Amino acid sequence: RMMGTQATASCGAVIAHHQAPLAAVRRELHAAEQRAKNEGGRDAFSITIIKRSGGALRLTANWGEPVALLNDLRAFLAADGVSRRAAYHTLEWLDAQTLPAPEGDGAMLQSLLAYQLDRQAGGPAKAQAAPLALRLTAQTLNQPAAQRIGWLRNFISVAEFLAREVRTSAAEAP
């Protein structure tokens, strides 16, 4: 029996500290899977990152471009020419309390993102700043208006967390 062309895939993933209680991690995993099914429309992924400090990041998005963008942003943030503080500087001004929710074509958001990413990059990575800003803005505008800034903050934070591991692994390589 085949699943057919209408089959969907939902996936939940949790990244946790090795000393995090396993029962809590399993609960988060179940919650992530449910978010992927409910918030993502039964064809999505949901990543939860449980920080050592006790906080958590949660990102839910559809398959396709958001996955590719997450990987590309992670690679950008891990690149040699990009400041390790790039994500933090971007998150500093990306505040839902002071920044209006992006509307229309999101030109203001795109311009601010491109400027900030470009400022924090050097070498070959600098050329990626504007295209990444364009793609980040497009994905942000796909979110409900009230959740756009929060979703973008989580997206950037998750990419930065994943980039840390790449930077650490590269620094330890002989």
Where are these regions (language model features)?
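Charged, helix-rich terminal subdomains or tails
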Residues: 1-174
